[in-house]
From Swiss-Prot:
Keywords: Antimicrobial, Disulfide bond, Fungicide, Plant defense, Protease inhibitor, Serine protease inhibitor. GO terms for molecular function: serine-type endopeptidase inhibitor activity. The keyword Coiled coil does not apply. Belongs to the thaumatin family. Signal peptide: none annotated. The keyword Disulfide bond applies. One of its GO terms (biological process) is killing of cells of another organism. This is Alpha-amylase/trypsin inhibitor.
Length: 206
């Protein structure tokens, strides 16, 4: 699958992509094409902001930093909005979503690209940061309750692993971005599928 990542934000982002792609700077209006093989799983694309890197590609980002390197090999640090995917899985389908489980830094859309007969995908185009609850504000953006409070009921682990429900915080995020994962058991309204072989477009600030 080809993923076209487009920065429509009025500022520079440093796009990141694992396990394929790594990372690169995207000025306003620039795009980046990433080819991911069928069978790729646990994949993420995200935007890093406020980055400074030296000529060797080392430095740091205010949001989404992945260990201080331009070329990410591991996931980014919360808070950051995530575009997630797994290719050619059950029933020959691709599964994809936008997650704000790790918080929110930049609005995204994640849509099928081209004429595969598949047209639905998630959009989280609202600036969640503008109305972020004060206790979730971090680095000028909006974190989720799980990374902030590390409690079972927010993270759906431990005592809440099998009995996890929306919280006031996840309902806030869901109200802002109905398509996005707002808490870990939010699968029903947040996972999208297309036939394997579909190409996709991820737009920052759609």
């Amino acid at each position: 699958a080809v993923f076209t990542v487009v920065n429509q934000c009025p500022f520079t982002v440093w796009a990141a992509s694992v396990p394929v792609g790594g990372g690169r700077q995207l000025n306003r209006g620039e795009s980046w094409r990433i080819t991911a093989p069928a069978g790729t799983t646990a994949a993420r694309i995200w935007a890093r902001t406020g980055c400074q890197f030296d000529a060797s590609g080392r430095g740091s980002c205010r949001t989404g930093d992945c260990g201080g390197v331009v070329q990410c090999t591991g996931y980014g640090r919360a808070p950051n909005t995530l575009a997630e995917y797994a290719l050619k899985q059950f029933n020959n389908l691709d599964f994809f979503d936008i997650s704000i489980l790790d918080g929110f830094n930049v609005p995204y859309s994640f849509l099928p690209d081209g004429g595969s007969g598949c047209s639905r995908g998630p959009r989280c185009a609202v600036d969640v940061n503008a109305r972020c609850p004060a206790e979730l504000r971090q680095d000028g953006v909006c974190n989720n309750a799980c990374p902030v409070f590390k409690k079972d009921e927010y993270c759906c682990v431990g005592s809440a692993a099998n009995n996890c429900h929306p919280t006031n915080y996840s309902r806030y995020f869901k109200g802002q971005c109905p398509d996005a994962y707002s808490y870990p058991k939010d699968d029903a309204t947040s996972t999208f599928t297309c036939p394997a072989g579909t190409n996709y477009k991820v737009v920052f600030c759609p």
